[in-house]
Amino acid sequence: LVGSEMCIRDSPDKNSFCYSGIFKTICTEISAKKEELEIIDLYRDPFTRPREKVIKKYKELVTWCDRIYIVSPVWWFRLTPRMEIFFDEVFEPGFAYKFVNITKTYAYPVPFLKSKKVRTYVTHGAPALPVLTLYVNSVKLRLVMGVYTFVFGWRLSLFTKTKQFWSVPFVSHKKRTEYLTTVKNDIRKDLGLSL
């Protein structure tokens, strides 16, 4: 049984760790298993307005796939502007979720993409300590609670499968290799391969 995998790549720099490290590792592992793989490249796809055609294509890919891999750097304590636009325009109400009223002034989101499996890798230039403590892990918290639970529903795996790699521009080659080993092992688990 062949699975359908989609990877959303969100890095303008082809030499970045997101692009040349994480993204390429994901593609290599999925290709080795002969899974179907579609790629959304937010910095190479035609993204200027009007973008109705590309948004329609993205929605079709989201509908088609079983699993979504998201790879993005963190800029200013959030993902890149293009990823934020992707969330706004693809994961919109009516396609990805709807609000159901409980009272006149309170509603909750009902996700439409609960069947999708999601794994996310984000890279930080910052070290872990200040982000996890002083900033209360706001990047991951906002991403999982403010985006993913709306469209994919609440589940613990959204937290555990959202990985953050720290101080990426400053760490040693050995540390980057450890990060990529984590990615490789995660993908192999996802694909049902032995480690």
Regions found by a protein language model. Name each.
Residues K34-F47, K161-W166:
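A short beta-strand-loop structural module common to alpha/beta enzyme folds
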Residues P130-L195:
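Glycine-rich phosphate/pyrophosphate-binding loop and the adjoining helix
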Residues F17-I22, V139-L143:
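Conserved alpha-helical elements of sugar-nucleotide-dependent glycosyltransferases
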Residues V54-V144:
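Helix-loop-strand module that forms the ligand-binding subsite of alpha/beta enzymes
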